[in-house]
């Protein structure tokens, strides 16, 4: 068996070898490192083939008005002077047609809206009983007069709201209410006439003296035809009596009563 003294050199050599291995110089090895970027062009989180495209299509990305970052590229700036506005006093006068139809949308060419007192100067609405007595042409004219009046009221209300005049709106609405009531009465009368016309057509279809297929002369009364036939028969009998020969013996004597022989 070896003595402890004999083992010491071998243990010392082992310890020296381990110490030299632990203190061996390190050699740097270059490892390729991929650059990491947070921009949309370099950052690709999805690697599979069916991954969606995360491309940024915003042309104004990176521009900030708060941070004053500016645009992403330089803009072309020309040295041409900007046009200056012409003063209103130097503008040429605008030619306006004095007889233009749009002037009818205003009550007066000098004012855009009438005073409240002027708006209240109007009559009442037409009643249905009064409109029943009017012809078709009268109702047609009255309807378009009401349309024109409503256009004037709407134009005045628009100008009054735009200019913030603050008056006349209640009076204009009252005037408009009367106009709409008249138009409602016209519709009522025309509806009544239409229903009456439908009833007349149904009765005419059942009347043998009326032929609706003949628009020029649809009514042919039978009494008129009978009277005409009677008149034609009377004329024929009269002509026949004038053409027949007269028997001379049937003619009375032309001698007077004094010359006649006495018995």
Swiss-Prot record:
Keyword Methyltransferase appears in the UniProt entry: no
Gene3D superfamilies referenced in this protein's UniProt entry, alphabetically: 6.10.330.20
Location(s) in or outside the cell: Mitochondrion
Record region (Disordered): 51-92, 208-263
Cellular component GO terms, alphabetical: mitochondrial large ribosomal subunit
Molecular function via GO: structural constituent of ribosome
Keywords, sorted A to Z: Mitochondrion, Ribonucleoprotein, Ribosomal protein
Biased composition (Basic and acidic residues): 53-66
Residue ranges with Low complexity bias: 233-245
Polar residues composition-biased segments: 214-223, 246-257
Pfam families from the UniProt entry: MRP-L47 (PF06984)
GO biological process, one term: mitochondrial translation
Recorded superkingdom: Eukaryota
InterPro entries named among the record's database cross-references: MRP-L47_sf (IPR038340), Ribosomal_uL29_mit (IPR010729)
Family indicated by similarity: Belongs to the universal ribosomal protein uL29 family.
Role description: Component of the mitochondrial ribosome (mitoribosome), a dedicated translation machinery responsible for the synthesis of mitochondrial genome-encoded proteins, including at least some of the essential transmembrane subunits of the mitochondrial respiratory chain. The mitoribosomes are attached to the mitochondrial inner membrane and translation products are cotranslationally integrated into the membrane.
PANTHER family named in the record: LARGE RIBOSOMAL SUBUNIT PROTEIN UL29M (PTHR21183:SF18), RIBOSOMAL PROTEIN L47, MITOCHONDRIAL-RELATED (PTHR21183)
Quaternary data: Component of the mitochondrial large ribosomal subunit (mt-LSU). Mature N.crassa 74S mitochondrial ribosomes consist of a small (37S) and a large (54S) subunit. The 37S small subunit contains a 16S ribosomal RNA (16S mt-rRNA) and 32 different proteins. The 54S large subunit contains a 23S rRNA (23S mt-rRNA) and 42 different proteins.
Name of this protein: Large ribosomal subunit protein uL29m
Gene designation per UniProt: mrpl4
């Amino acid at each position: 068996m070896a003595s402890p003294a004999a083992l010491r050199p071998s243990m010392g050599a082992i310890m020296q070898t381990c110490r030299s291995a632990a203190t061996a110089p390190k050699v740097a090895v270059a490892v390729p490192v991929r650059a990491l970027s947070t921009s949309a062009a370099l950052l690709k989180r999805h690697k599979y083939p069916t991954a969606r495209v995360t491309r940024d299509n915003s042309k104004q990305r990176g521009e900030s008005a708060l941070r004053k970052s500016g645009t992403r590229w330089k803009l072309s700036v020309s040295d041409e002077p900007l046009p200056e506005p012409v003063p209103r006093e130097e503008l040429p006068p605008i030619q306006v047609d004095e007889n233009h139809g749009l002037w009818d949308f205003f009550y007066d060419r000098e004012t855009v809206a009438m005073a409240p007192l002027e708006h209240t100067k109007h009559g009442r609405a037409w009643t249905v009983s009064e409109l029943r007595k009017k012809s078709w042409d009268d109702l047609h004219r009255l309807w378009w007069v009401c349309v024109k009046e409503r256009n004037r009221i709407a134009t005045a209300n628009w100008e009054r709201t735009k200019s913030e005049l603050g008056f006349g709106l209640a009076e204009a609405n009252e005037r408009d209410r009367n106009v709409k009531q008249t138009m409602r009465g016209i519709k009522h009368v025309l509806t009544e006439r239409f229903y009456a016309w439908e009833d007349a057509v149904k009765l005419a279809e059942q009347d043998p003296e009326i032929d609706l297929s003949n628009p020029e002369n649809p009514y042919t009364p039978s009494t008129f035809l009978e009277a005409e036939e009677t008149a034609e028969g009377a004329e024929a009998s009269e002509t026949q009596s004038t053409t027949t020969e007269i028997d001379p013996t049937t003619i009375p004597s032309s001698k007077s009563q004094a010359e006649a022989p006495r018995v």
